[in-house]
Amino acid sequence: MSISSPLNIDNLLLNEAKGASVKDRLVFFCIKNIYRSVGPLSMIILRRRRRISFMGFLYKSIEILGLDNSFFLVFNMPKYDYKFCSLVTRKIPNFLVQDMYASMTSHEEDVRKHFSPKKGDIVVDVGAAFGLYAIPSSKQVGQNGKVFAIEAHPDNYEVLKRNVKLNNLTNVTCLNYAVYSTKTKVKIYTNYTIMSERVISGEEEKAKEVNADTLDNILEQNKISAEQVNWIKIDVEGAELEVLKGAHNILSNSKDIAISVEIHGKNNYEPVIDLLNLYNFKIIFQKNYDWGDSQVIARHLI
């Protein structure tokens, strides 16, 4: 499917199930056809001007059938020649709509144009989620390059591995770590969706405690030389400064390197930029969002 223009998510879901397991495709086929039969009637029965959305119908059906955390759809993206599978679950409301779908629209499109690894590069993706950057990077760097996709959240990590396998990628290594400024334990907070994770302390929310380490240590443990890294992408929902603090060896020793970082919140902008300046990085691309976040790509000055 093309992601260059807005799509109706209900129509998209009604037509996209290619690549899913036979069981999931059969379940989706049945739910889809039941919806097509009863959807128009819902307006009459419930006395509504608009019928219930297919997304809501799908979530409710999955809940009733007891398929939470086990039902997958696959989105085919011929424009970029890769696929993404997505977990559809009532326990993570609107994961498919708010995160995966939104990420495949123009919000990320112009950023990816400037995120440009070349053949043979080594890319480190911190906060890889389901592979939105890691999978295209795999094709950009080719068989002589490598991509290390680091994801802290266990559920995201499982979807990431599934997507790497779905696209038959052999140059992507998936790592289940939380990246931080020191070796410690951190809480991954999940707020409404599986993608909305924040590494912060002092908030009383539902959270998963996971082991964390510095990016320098993680790469060393996986036999990745700091000097070899060409691209780092960071999207960690507010912990980007802590990630950079734990990457001293990489930032000091890698000469041919660029960093793409999504800075969450206006208060985090200056500290992140100041740290990049300290290591002699120059901003080559910046995009500011209305909600206060910024996307920055910076390259090391030789």
Q: Residue spans of the language-model regions?
A:
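S-adenosyl-L-methionine
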Residues: 2-153, 158-219, 222-225, ...
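Conserved acidic-Pro-Pro-aromatic motif
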Residues: 3, 122, 217-302
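Hydrophobic pocket-lining residues within nucleotide cofactor-binding pockets
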Residues: 128, 152, 179-181, 236, ...
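Short N-terminal helix/helix-N-cap motif within the alpha/beta-hydrolase-1
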Residues: 132, 158, 184, 241-245
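Hydrophobic packing residues within well-ordered alpha-helices of enzyme cores
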Residues: 137, 160, 188, 243-247, ...
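A short helix-to-beta-strand connector/capping loop
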Residues: 145, 168-172, 206, 227, ...
